[in-house]
Amino acid sequence: MLLPRSVSSERAPGVPEPEELWEAEMERLRGSGTPVRGLPYAMMDKRLIWQLREPAGVQTLRWQRWQRRRQTVERRLREAAQRLARGLGLWEGALYEIGGLFGTGIRSYFTFLRFLLLLNLLSLLLTASFVLLPLVWLRPPDPGPTLNLTLQCPGSRQSPPGVLRFHNQLWHVLTGRAFTNTYLFYGAYRVGPESSSVYSIRLAYLLSPLACLLLCFCGTLRRMVKGLPQKTLLGQGYQAPLSAKVFSSWDFCIRVQEAATIKKHEISNEFKVELEEGRRFQLMQQQTRAQTACRLLSYLRVNVLNGLLVVGAISAIFWATKYSQDNKEESLFLLLQYLPPGVIALVNFLGPLLFTFLVQLENYPPNTEVNLTLIWCVVLKLASLGMFSVSLGQTILCIGRDKSSCESYGYNVCDYQCWENSVGEELYKLSIFNFLLTVAFAFLVTLPRRLLVDRFSGRFWAWLEREEFLVPKNVLDIVAGQTVTWMGLFYCPLLPLLNSVFLFLTFYIKKYTLLKNSRASSRPFRASSSTFFFQLVLLLGLLLAAVPLGYVVSSIHSSWDCGLFTNYSAPWQVVPELVALGLPPIGQRALHYLGSHAFSFPLLIMLSLVLTVCVSQTQANARAIHRLRKQLVWQVQEKWHLVEDLSRLLPEPGPSDSPGPKYPASQASRPQSFCPGCPCPGSPGHQAPRPGPSVVDAAGLRSPCPGQHGAPASARRFRFPSGAEL
């Protein structure tokens, strides 16, 4: 209740009186713009605040009434939209089941997979809205025949005759050649000159991948920092007490046995995580300096071994890609086409297993083990994709190589007339191969292993058991597929559609594998820190995809034979041309100034000011949080002072008093004390216990509080009446 305290008590000097605090709080609530509905007070207090804000007889302005009505309508619409979104949410029931049976750590993987599906659908919607629909609706003029280039390519390779017998429709689909002349690849997009069209398809095609990357970056960053404000308010080392979880975890609205079983598993997993973290914290506190030094040296040894594995994997991928691109005339041409994806898949299959084995040797905490394994797996995967991109650049774009066919046209025109399509086909094959590997591993490895383990008995089968569902490895697979999709946004604009289908099917495949064929980890972990690392890994993949794309768009010559930018030295050259055609001289000068070095100095000063303001605001928020914590502690102590004053002022019941009729009716609603005579948690320090019902033994009177000896019986003070007395 927001009522002033009428009982005075001893107070330290400098502490304001309760009446002053109450008046200040009333004044703050009166002038605050926070809706009364959102205030953390009882209904009686909210009515009082409402009367303070709108006294009786005072007519509010029409604008204020309209504003209040609009806020109410917006709030109701927002709540209705949130309820509708929760009701129509994708895989809500499946996520609830997985979280209850296997814990929030494994559930975070499936939630992350759903988030990636949403990102791909948004990217597809952006590309279809700004590129595909205008291209179909406006029907831009035909650019005419392509340039007839006379190529001088000594010793150029031709397709080997033995390859023709393998060219069936299935192989064309797997390699992407069946879709070469469709909108799946870059080469099928053709328009006329910019001056002959109202809507610039070239500019839309150029900016759509950049907008998709920016949209994915903002969504990932928002999801990453989603829990940081709550973590800042609660503190770094905050943990909810086990007593609160024991008494408040159960949902009493459950009426179905299956839901009750899932809820029991969920509570059990939460307690396992809490107890495991507490046990490890105690072990860390008991270690000596020598044990700590040995532990750090073992950590260093494991990380060095993991680094050597990454270097070896990168070397294997580089030589496999180089051999595949340099030996196209051999009879094994079809197998060599899938040699780089095969080596990358083999590395990504063996790497997480080795990393998990090495990390588990050091007995890390579960969260640290998952995050460290995930970091090394991501380093391996992103490094392999980076090396794959570098090797393609050396072969197709002659980056770092001296080749005569690259001097005149800027790329290896003898072997790759439309090099954007070639790069798109490589990324298409990589995406297809990753999904096929996921399907094959689920139904050709995990399923037979489960059937054999369930069918036979013995030491070997007991040792083999079901496969453990490794979260780092599964996260690595979907992050790798998403990174490949981002890398192919320019060369294969509809690759997000393909990846969306793969992610949708992957969810059900992984769910079946988890529920039927796998076993959960015996060491559960929290979802909070793992979710943060998932988003961090995704940002690293986004950075890996954005750097090559920016380099290609700004510096690499486009193909002379296909695509939208055949007459441009680089795709970005279309932007200055459109600026010169569509903007007045003032706008051109303004854009030229924004892109010049002279604008960098005021931009740097402005960013410095913004950064200073943000840092200052962060520090002010931290100080405010510290003050609010102290105020909360003071309020708890103030309530205990009120209880002490009340216990001193109320009369003690005499020995002849009988319970029931002699107590006034107002005492019937008096709360019971959960710890009569003992200092309860949150009380201001240790005080002499108030004796309640005690146990008498041979030694005399005992205190009801554990570990404390009672006072004489004559020192009895007032205590709250028990339930039997009431």
UniProtKB/Swiss-Prot annotation:
Residues annotated with Phosphoserine modification: 6, 658, 673
Location of region: TMC domain: 362-530
Any Pfam family matching the protein: TMC
Single GO BP term: intracellular zinc ion homeostasis
UniProt feature, compositional bias: Pro residues: 652-662
A GO molecular-function annotation: protein sequestering activity
Membrane-spanning segments: 115-135, 201-221, 300-320, 339-359, 427-447, 489-509, 532-552, 595-615
GO cellular component: cytoplasm; endoplasmic reticulum; endoplasmic reticulum membrane; extracellular exosome; extracellular space; Golgi apparatus; Golgi membrane; nuclear membrane
UniProt family annotation: Belongs to the TMC family.
Entry note about domains: The TMC domain mediates the interaction with SLC30A1/ZNT1.
Quaternary structure (record): Interacts with TMC6. Interacts and forms a complex with TMC6 and CIB1; the interaction stabilizes each component of the complex. Interacts and forms a complex with TMC6 and SLC30A1/ZNT1; the interaction regulates zinc transport into the ER. Interacts with TRADD; the interaction competes with TRADD/RIPK1/TRAF2/cIAPs complex I formation and facilites complex II formation.
Protein name: Transmembrane channel-like protein 8
Species of origin: Homo sapiens
